Amino acid sequence: MLKRIGLELLHHIPFTAAGAVTGIAAMALVTLFNTPMNVSEALFFTFHPLHVVFSAMVTTAIFRRNKNSRLWLTIIVGYVGSVGVATLSDAIIPYLEGKSLQIDMEFHLPLISTEIMPYFNVPHWVIVNAAAIIGIIIGYFKPNTKFPHMIHVLISTWASLFGFTAFGTADWLPLLPVLFVFLFLAVWLPCCVSDIVFPLLWVKGEPAHAHH
């Protein structure tokens, strides 16, 4: 199993690198146009919930198809596999990476935040947890749904990107080369754990997502 996981991680390096390139391009535009932080925050809370939905769908569907388990256990697996991974990838890792560069970063956990989201007037935790519930429901009742891994990579990349610009203050342009590496790592390991390691743990055949 470890050999297969290693091969899958190597296989997904090009996907993740391509996603990181789009993230760096977006960050350059955000910097050049002096995009306000509240806009970055709104974008973060667009892509982060999408990331949660996608992860919840995949994780729940895999567990649902291959384990005849009780509903409560399926919900726990779907929730932890989505909110846990997305929080790590989109919030915790960008914060730690930003602090390692001595960037002024605000530590923010969306799944428990009571702050009101700009433009939507809804608490952050409501949006994130609702996204997880939606993903779990879809994965439970439509377990044969398949998505390209590249979609997950792009959504996660953009969520991580806006995790930097929404909660960090810095002159981003000189940092773009380093941030490319950081974006790559923030997406590659968590997303591959969610989309690859989970399938290899629960599925005896092919993973539940399609590689395109």
What are these regions (language model features)?
Residues M1-W72:
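N-terminal topogenic module of multi-pass integral membrane proteins
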Residues K3-G19, Y140-H212:
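C-terminal transmembrane helix-loop-helix hairpin of multi-pass membrane proteins
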Residues F44-S55, P118-N129, F182-V187:
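Alpha-helical transmembrane segments of polytopic membrane proteins
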Residues N68-V77, H211:
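Membrane-interface alpha-helices at helix entry/exit sites of multi-pass transporters
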